[in-house]
Amino acid sequence: MSTNFNELPVVVIGAGPVGLATAAHLRERGLTPLVLEAGATIGAAIEQWGHTRLFSPWQYDIDSAARRLLEPTGWTEPDPDALPTGHELIKHYLAPLAKLLGDDVIRTGARVVAVSREGIDKTRSAGREQTPFLVRVQAADGAVTDVRARSVIDASGTWGQPNPLGRSGLPAPGENAAID
């Protein structure tokens, strides 16, 4: 494991369209991405509504950096005017992009449970900007590990994390008691 701050990976939380596009942009810039996906597969949230057709055609669904990475591989870009389903988005875009990025970049079944700065707490903050992040990850089998990162990008999305009904991002009185 590298001890040089600039050689540490940039952790991306979530392997959906935004997370994988972020990894493509990082790779283009010569940075090392590490994508951590809580689900068992890339695009796990999309799988839950995969039968649904998107409102936006392919021309708006494919990120430019991802396209630049995919084009030299012989990947066939879908019809830019067609409206894909969630399953088609995964099959024709996310899966090829994930395969290109590789298993060393994407870890599925890896839920981020906490993010902190290494050696920093409420009383120690000197040198914070050059201190690695510490990302605590829980694997599907329950094992917990810490990953050092130069930065962290949250692309986990909102699926399964609904906005509370109350004001200011807080649950309405009684809302938590009514949750199934």
Predicted regions and their residues:
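Feature captures the FAD/FMN-dependent oxidoreductase FAD-binding
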Residues: T76-Q161
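Glycine-rich active-site loop/strand segments that organize a redox cofactor
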Residues: T41-H92
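Short glycine-/acidic-enriched loop or helix-start segments at secondary-structure transitions
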Residues: T22, A45, R117, N163-L165
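Conserved Rossmann-like nucleotide-cofactor binding loop
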Residues: V18, T41, W159
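N-terminal Rossmann-like FAD-binding beta1-loop-alpha1 element of flavoenzymes
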Residues: L8-V35
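Glycine-rich dinucleotide-binding loop and its adjacent helix/turn
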Residues: S156-D180
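A short, basic/flexible loop-to-alpha-helix module at the beginning of a structural domain
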Residues: M1-L8, D180
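Glycine-rich FAD pyrophosphate-binding loop
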Residues: R27-W49
